[in-house]
Amino acid sequence: MLELLPTAVEGVSQAQITGRPEWIWLALGTALMGLGTLYFLVKGMGVSDPDAKKFYAITTLVPAIAFTMYLSMLLGYGLTMVPFGGEQNPIYWARYADWLFTTPLLLLDLALLVDADQGTILALVGADGIMIGTGLVGALTKVYSYRFVWWAISTAAMLYILYVLFFGFTSKAESMRPEVASTFKVLRNVTVVLWSAYPVVWLIGSEGAGIVPLNIETLLFMVLDVSAKVGFGLILLRSRAIFGEAEAPEPSAGDGAAATSD
């Protein structure tokens, strides 16, 4: 199964990629991830607070990684053809490489925000690896029915992650500074809503039931990716919650703390 991945580099040409209707969404995703990376880099240049620096480093790395993976898909290096149902079906495996690195970084942002213990962080990262890994196995599986078995395992791992965010992390956030609690709740809600949509898109897309065509699936994943990475970062890095208590600047019209959301 995994031997399919090198074939993608050799067997898919630039002409084949640009001739696909999803090409425009990959180009847009590449541009938005690149712009997000540059914005976070510039915004973080004048930051001196040690706590804020950690958040800037992690949060900037997220769209930077996504940019490289979207670029690889755009140029045809992140695509493979998987035979099932009597057809050759295009699967963008680079999407999973993106998620494998970026999703634990997003979880690390949330964990640092609420000062989570190391054991909880390791458990979340482990569950995240299972979530992404089994999703990739499902996407590359040639037996159609087995795809949904792997999807179910991946979704179960995601539900565990969201459970920890909604219950374990929320109780920790509520005992912290008001700006930390309010920012965490906004980011928690954004993460829960967006991450919950991923298995739905997977299920109806080319990896699953094939209800929607690949170009629509690519559009949906691109919107989710940009929102979950760049959108997440914009909320986090505009909040005073990332600064140490002594360093937190006064809120302004453009840089206020995130609004409280339950």
Curated annotation (Swiss-Prot):
The keyword Cytoplasm does not apply. The covalent binding of retinal to the apoprotein, bacterioopsin, generates bacteriorhodopsin. InterPro entries: Arc/bac/fun_rhodopsins, Rhodopsin_retinal_BS. GO terms for cellular component: plasma membrane. PROSITE patterns: BACTERIAL_OPSIN_1 (PS00950), BACTERIAL_OPSIN_RET (PS00327). The modification Pyrrolidone carboxylic acid is found at residue 14. The modification N6-(retinylidene)lysine is found at residue 229. The record marks 98 as: Primary proton acceptor. It is found in: Cell membrane. Light-driven proton pump. This is Bacteriorhodopsin. It comes from Halobacterium salinarum (strain ATCC 700922 / JCM 11081 / NRC-1) (Halobacterium halobium). The gene is bop.
